[in-house]
Design a protein with these regions (language model features):
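Cyclophilin-like peptidyl-prolyl cis-trans isomerases
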Residues: 4-7, 13-205
Length: 205
């Protein structure tokens, strides 16, 4: 797969929003290291987060998991040999709370290797907010574009690689409709998508 196309794909799948890192959403400070366990329609996997890698991202992820934001969220974009993306809440009202709650950019301290977890963003500055992707392979070329990993799948990567990818690159759900219609849209038009049953903080170190 063309590397430039892959980087562009992550950018283009984000709906255009105005960067506003001062929006009224307060994130908790995450522990230095913690794990989040995801129970999915395919089985469980665990992400270990190291706050020192990307503190702003770690705090947002920690807050979202603790608030149950990812519960019942769909893996709406899964591309074999590239990545699995999720992070839009199934309730438009809840998703709307983060519409302008963007995060300031952080320089990558780790590389986008297989199993590493990163917030998606646009090409313009400070556009990370709730969407995340898990790298399926060495995508280290994304580092130069500012995609900063904050964690790594430490258990269940085989589950992540089983997520439904049959809709491919052409028949990708419309993110604007996910935001405005939620899971009702995805259930009706993309019924085979795998989803997160629950996501919970597993332990702290």
């Amino acid at each position: 797969m063309n590397k430039c196309w892959c980087a562009l794909a992550i950018v283009l799948t984000l709906a255009a929003i105005q960067a506003n890192p001062t929006a009224q959403v307060t994130d908790e400070q995450a522990p230095p290291t913690f794990r989040a366990r995801f129970e999915t329609s395919q089985g469980p996997f665990v992400i270990e987060v190291h706050r020192e890698w990307a503190p702003i991202a770690a705090d947002r992820f920690y807050t979202l998991v603790r608030r149950g934001f990812y519960n019942d969220a769909r893996f709406f974009r899964v591309l074999n040999g590239f990545m699995a993306q999720f992070g839009l809440n199934g309730d438009p009202k809840i998703q709307g709370e983060y519409a302008t709650a963007n995060l300031l950019d952080e320089p990558p301290k780790q590389s986008n290797l297989r199993g590493f977890v990163t917030f998606a963003k646009e090409s313009s500055p400070n556009t990370r907010y709730t969407m995340i992707f898990i790298n399926y392979k060495d995508n280290s070329y994304l580092d130069a574009d500012g995609f900063a990993p904050f964690g790594q799948v430490v258990s269940g990567m085989e589950i992540v690689e089983k997520l439904y990818s049959g809709y491919g690159r052409q028949n990708v759900p419309d993110q604007r409709r996910i935001k405005s219609e939620g899971n009702a849209y995805l259930t009706a038009e993309y019924p085979k998508l795998d989803f997160i049953k629950t996501a919970q903080i597993e332990n702290t170190k």
